[in-house]
Amino acid sequence: MSALAELKEQLRVVPPPQRAKALEKAREITRKKPWVPNPGPQTDAYFCLADVLLYGGEAGGGKSQLAIGIGVNEADRGIIFRRELTQTDGIEADGKSIIGKTAGFNGTDHEWTWFNGKSLKLGAMQGVDDWIPHAGRERDYMAFDEAGEFLEVQVASIGAWLRAPPGKRTRMVLPSNPPRSADGLW
């Protein structure tokens, strides 16, 4: 049973005045978030405590949205990779829709920057060694959208820079469909 299903079940037996209070509290909390996960698996993935999360599903199932949402809500310095930079156009459009005017977007660097210094970048790693230009840049969040398209060496190598100050959570999210070639069979 998902966390949301459990919560719904528990709320069913709560007296109406307390239930209304709990729902208002939930609305208040989510009002402060630019992005809120869909009920079900996406919510379970969002709140999952795993440091590295593989999130699969069918086309249109919210995998890329999850990558953006975690980056927007939780990361201080994040990056979302696709195998080719031209494949980030959908992520860029969705990100602009979610983020709006709360952050500036630099189209040359493919990066949003907030007034408080927080950033979320779109990147690519097509060739086996294309992780190298990203090396040395510590990030507290990395997502590999369509993870089954990446080489294991790319993810493992750049993952060494998934770091944060003490007390700050780091996350790697791997939204993916099944791999289309042997490259993704890791």
Residue ranges and their predicted role:
Residues 2-186:
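Phosphate/NTP-binding elements of NTP-utilizing enzymes
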